[in-house]
Amino acid sequence: MRTYRYFLLLFWVGQPYPTFSTPLSKRTSGFPAKKRTLELSGNSKNELSRSKRSWMWNQFFLLEEYTGSDYQYVGKLHSDQDRGDGSLKYILSGDGAGDLFIINENTGDIQATKRLDREEKPVYILRAQAINRKTGRPVEPESEFIIKIHDINDNEPIFTKEVYTATVPEMSDVGTFVVQVTATDADDPTYGNSAKVVYSILQGQPYFSVESETGIIKTALLNMDRENREQYQVVIQAKDMGGQMGGLSGTTTVNITLTDVNDNPPRFPQSTYQFKTPESSPPGTPIGRIKASDADVGENAEIEYSITEGEGLDMFDVITDQETQEGIITVKKLLDFEKKKVYTLKVEASNPHVEPRFLYLGPFKDSATVRIMVEDVDEPPVFSKLAYILQIREDAQINTTIGSVTAQDPDAARNPVKYSVDRHTDMDRIFNIDSGNGSIFTSKLLDRETLLWHNITVIATEINNPKQSSRVPLYIKVLDVNDNPPEFAEFYETFVCEKAKADQLIQTLRAIDKDDPYSGHQFSFSLAPEAASGSNFTIQDNKDNTAGIFTRKNGYNRHEMSTYLLPVVISDNDYPVQSSTGTVTVRVCACDHQGNMQSCHAEALVHPTGLSTGALIAILLCIVTLLVTVVLFAALRRQRKKEPLIISKEDIRDNIVSYNDEGGGEEDTQAFDIGTLRNPEAIEDSKLRRDIVPEALFLPRRTPAARDNTDVRDFINQRLKENDTDPTAPPYDSLATYAYEGAGSVADSLSSLESVTTDGDQDYDYLSDWGPRFKKLADMYGGVDSDKDS
């Protein structure tokens, strides 16, 4: 290939270079108005006329990928102002000037210093100018020219993908489109055949072919079967130079997969299947599974199962398991071994998705025979009915037979059966059953008005196998008997005005009856015989199970008779006739002109409920006595004397003890002001304490005396409680108020002891100067240092 490139280069250089002339762009600003032209001569595909110009150019085409050891000559720059004395300097600027292209500033020769690649940059635009060396001014306007890079076939075709993936349905016709591959060539498509790509297949025949110009891959073999071979690898070559010898080429791989079509019917691996199931299997119980195989995949391998014919067409069913594609045989109806022991079915497997163009391959279904054998099971007794409904009159006597139930063993053995009542459904044991024949009879009296329906359960059990039992519901309806008399629907109490007129309606009566006669209720109303004669009221039956009470005379006097009690007889028309007597209370009241009641007799409206006058007086006296007792107790409690705090004949202020062995001064014997202890209000402001070390003499603060009625004991108890609950209380030092000893005291304050410091830090020699009272204390603390020294 390198030899070929050299050949092209030599061929190009050896060609005669025709000359042409063309005007180039000129920049005239800054120059005298003198018309100048440039003359360029060099390589060109067309021969042009030559004319004299200010510039002469020998070459403007370069071959790419030049591999010579010397710089590649581009052309020569010359100005007609150049006299050959070196007074002019040639300058080159533009694309690649000084790097890719250099110019001899004396001769104007231009050379390429590096190997150029047309695919990187096909055209370079440069500018040339001649400058006077002495003045540094241009002698010609700057002119622009172009260097074009000629293409050579140095790039092979490259596919857009290294590996292609494609699919095509199996059994496709010849020429079915599969995929299109594309390769690109970086060479110049406008120059020669360097970029003209031709496709060919290197691997994959005779199954596939490729169009040389488009790169479209098509099927080349008829009826390719996925079940025989699914994957194909095809290698495609793209070659430039129109596929001629010496062209560059590239390859790509195309992985082609045949997709499935439904071209295979399902097939049972065997023609006959046999299963067993007990006769006690409930509907929906699976018996067995059958499976047909299909060489296809996906939805083309889906199978539907159905029972097409056979003795058990109505007794069994088949459903399809969508995950395993199996047919599940299930029980459709209850089986009976005693009736039929063996069933034969024909099960068919078919594809739900069939392509019509493959029907010529045959029917896409298969069938198999399934034999089902029913196994005998010891079954519980079976009642002749699913439920029983019986009736009985509510006046039936005990042990009256209502009806019977029947059950028998369905097995061939015909085991005997006994009957019983489930007592959970008959807690009151109202009914009983004959265990031998199933007769139902009463064991207690019935009442329809208490319970109309009795729902009980009867159990039938095999005598030889008590585990085998069955149940049946029994509904017993109690028939009505006219055994309840009618009665008022409510308690009737009404009134009549004193000025009422005769035949005036004062009350409408209604009745109810607990019985439920077949023809409905029909009540009749009348006054009791003892009240029918001489009554001040009459009753009128409305023939609609209601009646009205009317006045018989004009005017009533409530002072003579305030209340009338009317006995009313209510009867039904059923058999036997039942009747009852109800009382209607009629009160005589004063009414206004519109007939509205205003007032009745006190006994008629208000019952004397409450306490008598004597009882009220007694209760009032008890309350007064209790109040007096409470008042006296409170007064005595307030006047009770308080115990003294200190029982002493001495003055409470004499709390400074006088010693006879040492005369005290006036300040020692003078009683101090006790107001400090008896003024809690003054001390209340200084409850918060701060622990400090006293640094100066404590000056006692005089507090005015407290009020005489201040209880000192209560104050001391209060202070004691506060100190007990105060977390800042001693043993550590704090400012406190002590009894004032006078200004002449040797120990200014107890705080001067500074008990917070350690014994080693104290000098107790001054205790011996305090006098005989502190002699013992001075001996105790004064010997500490001597003990340590010893």
Curated annotation (Swiss-Prot):
Domain (Cadherin): residue spans on this chain: 54-159, 160-268, 269-383, 384-486, 487-608
GO-annotated biological processes: adherens junction organization; calcium-dependent cell-cell adhesion via plasma membrane cell adhesion molecules; cell migration; cell morphogenesis; cell-cell adhesion mediated by cadherin; cell-cell junction assembly; homophilic cell adhesion via plasma membrane adhesion molecules; Notch signaling pathway
Protein topology in the membrane: Single-pass type I membrane protein
Annotated source species: Bos taurus
TM region positions: 616-636
Protein name, per record: Cadherin-6
Modified positions (Phosphoserine) in chain numbering: 786, 790
Signal peptide as annotated in the record: 1-18
A GO molecular function held by the record: cadherin binding
Topology Cytoplasmic: residue spans: 637-790
Domain comment, as recorded: Three calcium ions are usually bound at the interface of each cadherin domain and rigidify the connections, imparting a strong curvature to the full-length ectodomain.
PANTHER family, per the entry: CADHERIN-23, CADHERIN-6
Alphabetized Pfam families for the sequence: CADH_Y-type_LIR (PF01049), Cadherin (PF00028)
Cellular component, GO, one term: glutamatergic synapse
Polar residues: bias regions: 269-279
Topology feature Extracellular, residues: 54-615
Keywords: Calcium, Cell adhesion, Cell membrane, Cleavage on pair of basic residues, Glycoprotein, Membrane, Metal-binding, Phosphoprotein, Repeat, Signal, Transmembrane, Transmembrane helix
Region of interest (Disordered), ranges: 261-291
Its biological purpose: Cadherins are calcium-dependent cell adhesion proteins. They preferentially interact with themselves in a homophilic manner in connecting cells; cadherins may thus contribute to the sorting of heterogeneous cell types.
Residues modified by glycosylation: 255, 399, 437, 455, 536
InterPro entries, sorted: Cadherin (IPR039808), Cadherin-like_dom (IPR002126), Cadherin-like_sf (IPR015919), Cadherin_CS (IPR020894), Cadherin_Y-type_LIR (IPR000233), Catenin-bd_sf (IPR027397)
Removed propeptide positions: 19-53
Subcellular location: Cell membrane
